[in-house]
Amino acid sequence: MQPYQRDFIRFAIDRGVLRFGEFTLKSGRTSPYFFNAGLFNTGSALAQLGRCYAAAIVDSKIPFDVLFGPAYKGIPLAAATAVALAEQHQLDVPWCFNRKEAKDHGEGGSLVGAPLAGDVLIIDDVITAGTAIREVMQIINAQQAKAAGVLIALNREERGNGELSAIQEVERDFGIPVVSIVSLTQVLEFLADDPQLKQHLPAVEAYRAQYGI
């Protein structure tokens, strides 16, 4: 595990973004942990989150021309990541996002920011069913651009209804890598090393044994 990954897990726990207990997911599964990226909701938290995404991009070595943040949650993530790449890594990359509703006045259209062209790295918080990414792929294709990959905060490494996870389905269907700041494997590693949090390890391991990929 890289230092930025350990820092991210500690940061997510401290912010209440990553919690342990008993949670009913939309899928109906009862999960021993819950991840809510919406709680990275202050200026300093967003700045630190952007630094984590930027570190993951550099670590991934995925070549790309532009960052894309899907509306709505991806917009601040792409912005914060672009800032962190410039300030921490001296990489001044273009970024853009889409509107949910196209405008017919002013700058018009459904895209805002840099042109959506070349190799596009998509930034989002999680991939649950893959529906949002499929919509993004249509936007990218409509601009004759090409998806370079997807970067998310947490990979739950969890099966959907079939044998594959939603992330594996995206990788299979579009032939692009999906990388994450951290995965459940690293969360388990973190729990095992932390005396206060170790109590949650058996429940998370049991959940993984049942639903993991």
Curated annotation (Swiss-Prot):
<feature type="binding site">
    <location>
        <position position="103"/>
    </location>
    <ligand>
        <name>5-phospho-alpha-D-ribose 1-diphosphate</name>
    </ligand>
</feature>
<dbReference type="InterPro" id="IPR000836">
    <property type="entry name" value="PRibTrfase_dom"/>
</dbReference>
<feature type="binding site">
    <location>
        <position position="105"/>
    </location>
    <ligand>
        <name>5-phospho-alpha-D-ribose 1-diphosphate</name>
    </ligand>
</feature>
<feature type="binding site" description="in other chain">
    <location>
        <begin position="124"/>
        <end position="132"/>
    </location>
    <ligand>
        <name>5-phospho-alpha-D-ribose 1-diphosphate</name>
    </ligand>
</feature>
<comment type="pathway">
    <text>Pyrimidine metabolism; UMP biosynthesis via de novo pathway; UMP from orotate: step 1/2.</text>
</comment>
<dbReference type="InterPro" id="IPR023031">
    <property type="entry name" value="OPRT"/>
</dbReference>
<feature type="binding site">
    <location>
        <position position="128"/>
    </location>
    <ligand>
        <name>orotate</name>
    </ligand>
</feature>
<feature type="binding site">
    <location>
        <position position="156"/>
    </location>
    <ligand>
        <name>orotate</name>
    </ligand>
</feature>
<protein>
    <recommendedName>
        <fullName>Orotate phosphoribosyltransferase</fullName>
        <ecNumber>2.4.2.10</ecNumber>
    </recommendedName>
</protein>
<feature type="binding site" description="in other chain">
    <location>
        <position position="100"/>
    </location>
    <ligand>
        <name>5-phospho-alpha-D-ribose 1-diphosphate</name>
    </ligand>
</feature>
<comment type="subunit">
    <text>Homodimer.</text>
</comment>
<dbReference type="GO" id="GO:0044205">
    <property type="term" value="P:'de novo' UMP biosynthetic process"/>
</dbReference>
<keyword id="KW-0665">Pyrimidine biosynthesis</keyword>
<dbReference type="GO" id="GO:0006207">
    <property type="term" value="P:'de novo' pyrimidine nucleobase biosynthetic process"/>
</dbReference>
<dbReference type="InterPro" id="IPR004467">
    <property type="entry name" value="Or_phspho_trans_dom"/>
</dbReference>
<dbReference type="GO" id="GO:0046132">
    <property type="term" value="P:pyrimidine ribonucleoside biosynthetic process"/>
</dbReference>
<feature type="binding site">
    <location>
        <begin position="34"/>
        <end position="35"/>
    </location>
    <ligand>
        <name>orotate</name>
    </ligand>
</feature>
<feature type="binding site" description="in other chain">
    <location>
        <begin position="72"/>
        <end position="73"/>
    </location>
    <ligand>
        <name>5-phospho-alpha-D-ribose 1-diphosphate</name>
    </ligand>
</feature>
<keyword id="KW-0808">Transferase</keyword>
<dbReference type="Pfam" id="PF00156">
    <property type="entry name" value="Pribosyltran"/>
</dbReference>
<keyword id="KW-0460">Magnesium</keyword>
<comment type="similarity">
    <text>Belongs to the purine/pyrimidine phosphoribosyltransferase family. PyrE subfamily.</text>
</comment>
<comment type="function">
    <text>Catalyzes the transfer of a ribosyl phosphate group from 5-phosphoribose 1-diphosphate to orotate, leading to the formation of orotidine monophosphate (OMP).</text>
</comment>
<dbReference type="InterPro" id="IPR029057">
    <property type="entry name" value="PRTase-like"/>
</dbReference>
<dbReference type="GO" id="GO:0000287">
    <property type="term" value="F:magnesium ion binding"/>
</dbReference>
<keyword id="KW-0328">Glycosyltransferase</keyword>
<feature type="binding site" description="in other chain">
    <location>
        <position position="26"/>
    </location>
    <ligand>
        <name>5-phospho-alpha-D-ribose 1-diphosphate</name>
    </ligand>
</feature>
<dbReference type="GO" id="GO:0004588">
    <property type="term" value="F:orotate phosphoribosyltransferase activity"/>
</dbReference>
<dbReference type="GO" id="GO:0005737">
    <property type="term" value="C:cytoplasm"/>
</dbReference>
<feature type="binding site">
    <location>
        <position position="99"/>
    </location>
    <ligand>
        <name>5-phospho-alpha-D-ribose 1-diphosphate</name>
    </ligand>
</feature>
